[in-house]
Design a protein with these regions (language model features):
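Polytopic alpha-helical membrane proteins, predominantly small-molecule transporters/carriers
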Residues: 1-423
């Protein structure tokens, strides 16, 4: 199995691929309303897949979670709460795109999410200034974060250039509700709440430690955390989707193969229920694997686990942009616009390399220190062995001296007896 920082970067790329790809199967879902297929996929994203994978790959899942709630209820409650807040971030992301447009909305929301998810844990722990002053690898990771933000900004410019080149009717539809002030405020909310996933993962670290105590391999110890955090995310999404289904009268679509045709009001249409369910399940399971690989990658990042969030966000934007090219979403755009997109993807890719290099620097710098520690331990052990040998030798010498004194005394007594007999 891949080990070290390079393995961690690869796992985060795989997580980004899963996140950037999960929506593709939803395109095969026909006639279901958004809230119906989103919740159908959500059951697999937030309930079924997390518990199945954690149950298969970890030891004593239920006892671990029970022990976690008993030993550290605050950590588990925070994990669930942050999961709920993360769910709000995902739902408000749609409003961000509505008021700022696809390109500017994604650039602002994802940029805020990247910065907050990466830095706030260290800001909260009050270690960021100390780390900047004393740890060069930490500064390299912050440089990687800056490069990632630059890539997000360039991607935003590419998106705005694409929107300017759209046909007049499409452009009007895309910006008809544009509201910069409202959009920026919602983007701040969305970016912060979306970053709560990173906070939840960190808050539930005690559960990962308990999983390790139960014999779970270090690569899988983060999976039980996801069961709790994603349950919080499911709660938020379930309540919102249920509200929409009651409002739009679409709840019935879950249990029938004949529904009202959304394209022709007043008409009914038959749907392939199993096909819709299959592709929703495929999309939901694919979505889950972003955090499955995230939890694996985090275990390989060493002391700087916080950098996992930067790698995760950069990888998502890279692969979602590539899918946009594959699905011809950039068809008709100018060479300049496509060049901007290419530069954005390249910049984001470079940011993952910079962040990975910073972690690698820390890993390499830790090896000599570990070697010195081992030598010190070995030296101490050797000194202790010598000391024990000297003590043993002294004890043996004392025994010999005692025996010699006893023999000398016995000889004196024997000589006295012989002399007495001779007289």
């Amino acid at each position: 199995m891949l080990s070290g920082v390079l393995g961690g970067v690869l796992f985060h790329w795989l997580g980004g691929l899963a996140s950037g790809s999960f929506y593709v199967p939803y395109k095969a879902v026909k006639k279901w309303s958004w809230e119906v297929y989103w919740l159908a996929g959500g059951f697999f994203s937030w309930i079924i897949a997390p518990w199945i994978m954690a149950g298969l790959l970890t030891n004593d899942l239920i006892p671990v979670l029970r022990e976690g709630f008993s030993a550290n209820p605050k950590a588990c409650c925070l994990g669930y709460l942050f999961g709920m807040l993360w769910g709000i971030g995902g739902l408000t992301f749609g409003l961000t795109l509505r008021y700022l447009g696809m390109s500017l909305g994604m650039a602002v929301a994802l940029g805020i999410c990247t910065v907050m998810g990466t830095l706030i844990p260290d800001v909260y722990a009050r270690t960021i200034i100390e780390n900047i002053q004393s740890q060069p690898p930490y500064c390299v990771i912050l440089l990687g974060l800056g490069v990632c933000l630059l890539g997000v900004i360039i991607a935003g410019f590419a998106g705005m250039s694409k929107e300017r080149e759209m046909p007049a009717e499409e452009k009007k539809a895309a910006v008809k509700e544009f509201n910069f002030t409202k959009g920026i405020l919602i983007a701040l909310v969305s970016g912060f709440f979306s970053a709560c996933m990173a906070f939840g993962i960190q808050a539930m670290e005690p559960v990962a430690e308990i999983a390790a105590e139960h014999g779970t391999g270090d690569l899988w110890v983060g999976l039980p955390k996801l069961c709790v955090i994603l349950l919080g995310g499911f709660t938020t999404n379930f309540l919102w989707c249920l509200y929409l289904m009651l409002k739009n009268k679409t709840l019935y679509q879950f249990g029938t193969t004949t529904i009202q045709d959304p394209d022709q009001p007043g008409q009914t249409v038959k749907i392939n229920y199993l096909s819709n369910l299959f592709f929703s399940a495929l999309a939901g399971t694919t979505w889950y694997f972003q955090f499955f690989f995230y939890s694996m990658g985090e275990t390989r990042m060493g002391e700087y686990k916080f950098s996992s969030w930067t790698l995760h966000m950069a990888s998502i934007i890279i692969f979602s942009s590539l899918w946009g090219l594959v699905l011809h979403e950039w068809k008709g755009s100018s060479r300049f616009t496509k060049a901007l997109l290419g530069i954005a993807i390249g910049t984001l890719l470079y940011s993952t390399i910079v962040v990975g290099y910073g972690n690698l620097m820390k890993e390499i710098s830790a090896e000599p220190a570990a070697a010195v520690a081992v030598e010190a331990v070995e030296g101490e052990a050797a000194a202790q062995a010598v000391s024990e040998a000297v003590n043993q030798a002294n004890a043996t010498l004392d025994d010999l001296l005692e025996e010699g004194a006893a023999i000398e005394q016995q000889l004196e007594e024997t000589v006295e007896e012989v002399l007495e007999e001779a007289n």
